[in-house]
Amino acid sequence: MDKKTLCLYFQVHQPIRLRKYHFFDIGKNSDYYDDFANRTITRKVADRCYLPANRTMLELIRKYGKNFKVSFSISGMVIEQFREYAPEVIDSFKELVATGCVEILAETYSHSLASLVDEGEFKKQVKQHADLMKELFGVKPVTFRNTELIYSDEIGEMVARMGYKTMLTEGARHILGWKSPDYVYTNSINPKLKLLLKNFRLSDDIA
């Protein structure tokens, strides 16, 4: 029986929460962030989600070796909060990367929509994120995942020009039609960029 390959990728992101900012605060208070909510939520998801999940991933890697591999897309925003409130989460990702069975993906630093509005800002954030991944994990990402898997051939061509070999995107039914998301496609402007599509049915089943 032919072996089937399943590509698992996990998005890791937490937004920075803003506090309630009243009209009379204008000009008097520049403390925009809700530090209490950011700390509380980051600690909660670290203890209930990220740390247990990473322990499970590590156990599976130790059990199955190179036959079990995963990838993570970790935003700059969540790294900032991990550094402040839950540094042990970063350590757990470092331990996973050190196994050689984990790929770190590139994305925009701020989990932003810059690819839709400003090419310069988009490139700046992608480089900022890639530099952070290199600093933390000692790896240079070669696969790109845009915010919410946003894709167009023009965005893909930009990504290819930045040196990325592969890009993840949504396997949207209204785009694919009769085609399957379970194949490797290419960018129509720059065919050197490979496209891996999300199988939304399978993702929904295991989420």
Predicted segments, located by residue:
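Catalytic alpha-helical scaffold of carbohydrate-active enzymes acting on polysaccharides/glycoconjugates
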Residues: 1-142, 149-204
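Binuclear metal-dependent hydrolase catalytic cores centered on His/Asp/Glu-rich metal-binding motifs
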Residues: 207
